């Protein structure tokens, strides 16, 4: 029997503050809680999977007979960003946070970047990605400058107008930054943020974003699966997050709708291993922008995909749905990620329905369970498999 796992990360779909959330400035946050009662939220299929039956979830209506197994996962890494969250999902806990720069990057680093790119740098302080275009976009165009800014996450972001700085050139500048940012300056991601428009009111980000990540500190689930001869298909920004390590095929997407379509298409293909999908719009378009209505609508769009996907699952298929952190769209103290538990929903023809796995202390639960199912030794990874609890 061909065994396939479809692991879908709803980027930032947290389900309530973790016990240490206050230390991250995120006490009381709850991404699911923020959207569940909005008129745009209609997720009967996630309900059937057991979303509202999960430990600690107090919104929504519990399903009387969930068709899948479900758990709440607590992050063990010291961070709440995309890179660390995905590494932990893949079985690698990060005991130390990646460096952040709340006061901007050191002048010496910025000067070196200016010299190597031949462009002046503007901003160099934490900023909202949309607001930074309004405040610096026109100046950047007049002065042929690059907009560089950190955030609460471990990132070095470079924005430029595509009409003045071609996308391939912006990517090259980001590669220069990635080479520079090591050791104490080793941010999790260097992100190219191309935009278009001519005035502060018309600037908008394009879909040509590109992330250059640190390589994971050791082998992840992806490497182990690839080394064992399994397919590891990366959909969306998964390839970038792992810097390509352990990936056998990458599929670039332009957002949730596109990512969902590619995932549905993969269902009809023959492969043995893992399809690892990231749906970024939850985080990028709605979480950070604190758009409750948009976030709720995106959840509803995904729910419709679940309804379409499940009937087409083969005998050896398992669908897993999770998240990498929170980004509560109703939380107004910041526009950053939020330190939250994440859901773990599991279903398939061979998966027991209605198994409540409680709260598990590591996102690496996912990596261990996937490797266990695919027959790959994961003794070097963090977390514990729940396969024996969920298989029929």
Q: Model-derived features: where do they sit?
A:
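Feature captures the catalytic ectodomains and active-site-proximal regions of enzymes
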Residues: 1-392
């Amino acid at each position: 029997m061909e065994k396939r796992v479809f692991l879908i990360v709803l980027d930032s779909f947290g389900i309530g503050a973790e016990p240490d959330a206050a230390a991250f400035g995120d006490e009381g946050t709850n991404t699911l809680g923020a959207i569940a009662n909005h008129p745009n939220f209609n997720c009967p299929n996630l309900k059937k999977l057991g979303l509202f039956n999960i430990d600690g979830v107090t919104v929504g209506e519990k399903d009387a007979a969930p068709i899948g197994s479900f758990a709440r996962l607590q992050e063990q890494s010291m961070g709440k960003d995309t890179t660390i969250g995905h590494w932990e999902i893949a079985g690698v806990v990060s005991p130390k946070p990646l460096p952040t720069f709340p006061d901007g990057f050191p002048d010496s680093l910025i000067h070196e970047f200016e010299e190597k790119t031949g462009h002046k740098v503007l901003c160099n302080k934490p900023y909202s990605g949309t607001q930074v275009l309004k405040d610096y976009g026109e100046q950047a165009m007049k002065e042929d400058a690059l907009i560089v800014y950190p955030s609460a996450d471990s990132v070095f972001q470079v924005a430029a107008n595509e009409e003045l700085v071609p996308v391939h050139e912006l990517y090259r500048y980001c590669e220069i930054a990635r080479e520079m940012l090591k050791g104490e300056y080793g941010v999790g991601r260097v992100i190219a943020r191309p935009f278009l428009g001519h005035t502060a009111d018309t600037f908008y980000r394009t879909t040509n974003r590109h992330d250059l990540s640190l390589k994971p500190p050791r082998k992840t689930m992806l490497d182990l699966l690839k080394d064992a001869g399994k397919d590891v298909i990366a959909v969306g920004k998964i390839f970038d997050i792992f810097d390509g390590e352990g990936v056998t095929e990458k599929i670039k997407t332009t957002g949730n709708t596109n990512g969902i379509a590619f995932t549905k298409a993969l269902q009809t293909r023959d492969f043995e291993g893992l399809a690892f999908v990231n749906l970024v719009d939850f985080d990028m378009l709605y979480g950070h922008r604190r758009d409750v209505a948009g976030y709720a609508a995106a959840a509803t769009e995904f729910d419709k995909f679940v309804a379409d996907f499940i009937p087409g699952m083969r005998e050896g298929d398992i669908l897993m749905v999770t998240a990498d952190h929170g980004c509560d769209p109703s939380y107004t103290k910041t526009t950053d990620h939020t330190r939250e538990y994440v859901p773990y929903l599991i279903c398939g023809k061979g998966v027991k329905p209605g198994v409540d796995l409680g709260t598990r202390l590591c996102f690496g639960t996912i990596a261990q369970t996937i490797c266990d199912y695919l027959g790959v030794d994961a003794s070097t990874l963090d977390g514990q498999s729940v396969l024996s609890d969920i298989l029929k």
